[in-house]
Swiss-Prot record:
Function: Catalyzes a salvage reaction resulting in the formation of AMP, that is energically less costly than de novo synthesis.
Family as reported in the entry's similarity comment: Belongs to the purine/pyrimidine phosphoribosyltransferase family.
Biological classification of the source: Bacteria, Pseudomonadati, Pseudomonadota, Gammaproteobacteria, Pseudomonadales
NCBIfam families named in the record: apt, PRK02304.1-3, PRK02304.1-5
One annotated Gene Ontology cellular component of this protein: cytoplasm
Keywords, in A-Z order: Cytoplasm, Glycosyltransferase, Purine salvage, Transferase
The protein's name: Adenine phosphoribosyltransferase
Encoding gene (name): apt
Keyword Cytoplasm: yes
């Protein structure tokens, strides 16, 4: 299926003043209500990574799980879950990161990766990059490497993609929005 950025962008619902005044939240749930759009999104990532050399897909809590699990299945790769604090039942590694609301923690099971593994990180959106940067730190603490950080949406004005690229992590997104886009 051919990727149609316009079709995808029209299905990403802008929600003004959520979760706080002045923010335009980019709601991807309408993408999942359209089988055609979901297939277009998934197929675009699958085609990009079908011959790529990495060992695991790391999906970020929670919306990164939605497409990350499809990619893991289609590409026959193990899926590693990066969860919010307190959601994983076994031994974990934890990494603090800053959000626009304060500090949060991202966790991964301590036995999820081994030295030499290579991870494709996946989230729904790259904004400030805080969550993906925390995931990257966890991957590196486990002596694994990051193949790329991928997402459906980039908000380049918030600088997250640039922060990732500045520490040597390539990024790939299907579309981008300016903060003022409605």
């Amino acid at each position: 299926m051919i990727f149609d950025e316009f079709s995808i962008k029209t299905l990403i619902r802008p929600v003004p003043d959520f979760p706080r005044p002045g923010v335009i939240f980019r709601d991807i749930t309408p993408l999942f209500q359209s089988p055609k759009a979901l297939r277009m999104v998934a197929d675009s990532f699958i085609q990009r990574y079908v011959e790529a050399d990495f060992t695991h897909i790391g999906a970020l809590d929670a919306r990164g799980f939605l497409v990350g699990s499809i990619l893991a299945y289609e590409l026959n790769k193990p899926l590693v879950l990066f969860r919010k604090q307190g959601k994983l039942p076994a031994d974990v590694l934890s990494q603090a990161y800053c959000t626009e609301y304060g500090e949060a923690h991202l966790e991964i099971h301590a036995d999820s990766l081994c030295e030499g593994d290579s991870v494709l990180l996946f989230d729904d959106l790259i904004a400030t990059g805080g969550t993906l940067l925390a995931a990257a730190q966890l991957v590196r603490r486990m002596r694994a490497s990051i193949h790329e950080a991928a997402a459906i949406i980039d908000l380049p004005e918030l600088g997250g993609s640039q922060k990732l690229q500045d520490i040597g992590i390539p990024t790939f997104t299907l579309t981008a929005f300016e903060l003022s886009d409605r």
